[in-house]
Amino acid sequence: MNKLSVERIHKNMAAIHSKDTKPEMIVRKALWSRGFRYRLNSPKLPGHPDLVLKKYRTCIFVNGCFWHGHNVEVKSDKGEVISSECCKIPHTRREFWVAKIKRNQERDIETQKRLAEMGWHCITIWECELKPSKREQTLKSLAFTLNKIWLEEHAVIGKPYPQFEEEDGMLKAAEEQI
């Protein structure tokens, strides 16, 4: 493995932005092509969700596995960190990165709680779920979930049809034909 200089690492990290990332663009393009309309980075909602689908009362966060600690466990009693396959914690300045990722995870949980209290649904899509081998299934699942949310929100829940007593002539006639 090649060792990068501190300057090169700094340049790489500085080039990473929070908006218009490749995973976000994949999700945006897929949703738009399937007819879903959305707003980007809404400043009116906590956490500035990547995509906001007002019609579905749904916020979508497209998270990078490293920055949001996908499947990373921090054992606070010993300070041990269990890296996941898609999120490797750097060995240099490890304490800094563990603290940063843990703060990001806590912030994500708090943001989703606040959005849920406001009546919004939250969907998190991880960068590793958009790899070519999993991409189509992830995007189909996202579209299915959004349609399910819409149907649940717009379900007609009312009283069932009234049941008639046996004396009702139409009911008796219907039973006799059967």
Locate each region found by the language model.
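Nucleic-acid endo/exonuclease domains
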Residues: 1-124, 128-178
